[in-house]
């Protein structure tokens, strides 16, 4: 199975799927903000940044998927982004499921001074909502619960792809081939 996953990771389609899915989810978030009028909170902004990290990872490997170092960089960036997104989503979910006056998220994003994304791209990274509010649901799951599911899937898939890159598999001996 690992050999098959390694072969898949050398195909452009896998990395296109990663880049496209994260871009589609980012576009959906922007539609929720500007089309439906839902206000993003600070944690939503951080989750968007993690999704953009996944898009960048997919784009890096899409350039030349057969080059091992590019695949490794893309997998590392994608795994880092998906794990950070999952951890932020868990924190966000905790704020929504267990609201308390002492558990609040900040109002201004805490980006490094050298990368003030909320000032450079305010149409994407400017938070205007509260983290405690659940504004949308689908099939009984809130948007944050869906993000936990999505980031979990990304973590599992990218972890398996990374393991397939570093573990050597034995070639199967075939009788008639």
From Swiss-Prot:
What's one GO MF term for it?
protein-disulfide reductase activity
Entry keyword annotation includes Transmembrane = yes
Show the InterPro entries listed in the entry: DiS_bond_form_DsbB/BdbC, Disulphide_bond_form_DsbB, DsbB, DsbB-like_sf
Instruction: Locate the transmembrane regions by residue number.
Output: 15-31, 50-65, 73-90, 146-164
**Keywords of the record:** Cell inner membrane, Cell membrane, Chaperone, Disulfide bond, Electron transport, Membrane, Oxidoreductase, Redox-active center, Transmembrane, Transmembrane helix, Transport
**Is Ribosomal protein found in the keyword set?**
no
GO terms, biological process:
protein folding
Cytoplasmic face residues: 1-14, 66-72, 165-177
Q: Where in the cell is it found?
A: Cell inner membrane
Cysteines paired by S-S bonds: 41-44, 105-131
At the top level of its lineage, which domain of life is listed?
Bacteria
Name a GO CC annotation attached to this entry: plasma membrane
Which Pfam families does the entry mention? DsbB
Topological domains (Periplasmic): residue ranges? 32-49, 91-145
Membrane topology listed for this record: Multi-pass membrane protein
Q: Cross-referenced HAMAP family, in alphabetical order?
A: DsbB
Role played? Required for disulfide bond formation in some periplasmic proteins. Acts by oxidizing the DsbA protein.
Q: Which family does it belong to?
A: Belongs to the DsbB family.
UniProt-recorded name of the protein: Disulfide bond formation protein B
Q: Source organism lineage?
A: Bacteria, Pseudomonadati, Pseudomonadota, Gammaproteobacteria, Pasteurellales
């Amino acid at each position: 199975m690992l050999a098959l996953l390694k072969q898949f990771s050398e195909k452009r389609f896998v990395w296109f799927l990663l880049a496209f899915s994260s871009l589609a989810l980012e576009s959906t978030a922007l539609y929720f903000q500007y089309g439906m009028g839902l206000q993003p909170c600070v944690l939503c902004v951080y989750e968007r940044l993690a999704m953009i990290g996944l898009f960048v990872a997919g784009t890096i490997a899409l350039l030349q998927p057969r080059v091992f170092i590019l695949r490794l960089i893309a997998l590392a960036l994608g795994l880092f982004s998906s794990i950070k997104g999952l951890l932020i989503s868990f924190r966000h979910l905790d704020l929504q499921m267990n609201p308390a006056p002492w558990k609040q998220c900040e109002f201004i994003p805490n980006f490094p001074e050298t990368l003030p994304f909320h000032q450079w791209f305010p149409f994407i990274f400017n938070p205007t909502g509260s983290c405690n509010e659940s504004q949308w649901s689908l099939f009984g799951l809130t948007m944050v619960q869906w993000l936990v599911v999505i980031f979990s899937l990304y973590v599992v898939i990218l972890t398996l792809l990374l393991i397939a890159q570093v573990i050597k598999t034995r070639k199967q001996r075939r009788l008639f081939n």
